[in-house]
Amino acid sequence: MKSSKDNKKDLLLDIKNISIEGFSDEIWHPIIKGVNLQLYRGEVLGLIGESGAGKSTLGLAAMGFVRTGCRFTGGSIIFNGKDLTKLSEKKKQQLWGTKLSYVAQSAAAAFNPAHRLINQTIESSLSHKLDTKETLQKDAVQLYKEMQLPNPDQIGERYPHQVSGGQLQRTMTA
């Protein structure tokens, strides 16, 4: 039996020799240099390292995004056969929130405390007009079930401060 790594069609993310620099004190400094990784459909990947090692920068880069004051200086990021470093901002934005998402370390900081979870879950899909609000809400509840959130039919009506950090992270993933 072949593993998923033997089947190229299962390759979801292929980061090849990616390098990123940040601008500080009038010069560019390397932040990430020559990183390679592959992620296959169905796999889970965790990045572990010291504070300031570049984990968040690499996570954002995997979406084709670099922070203000940073730049890609080499390599490629292939997602579903497309090199994100070569796509226009418009094309990348079409992927963000629909095919690609980023779960921040501090999930609470990513949520608006004044809005219910369900509205924040569907916000990106609604802004891209992917479906009606009602359909997207039903889809969100189904995702809550798949993420094994408690009371998936009601949890979306809660505000971020009313759920745990782990539940917020799973909500972000949904």
How would you name each of these model-derived features?
Residues M1-A174:
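ABC transporter nucleotide-binding domains
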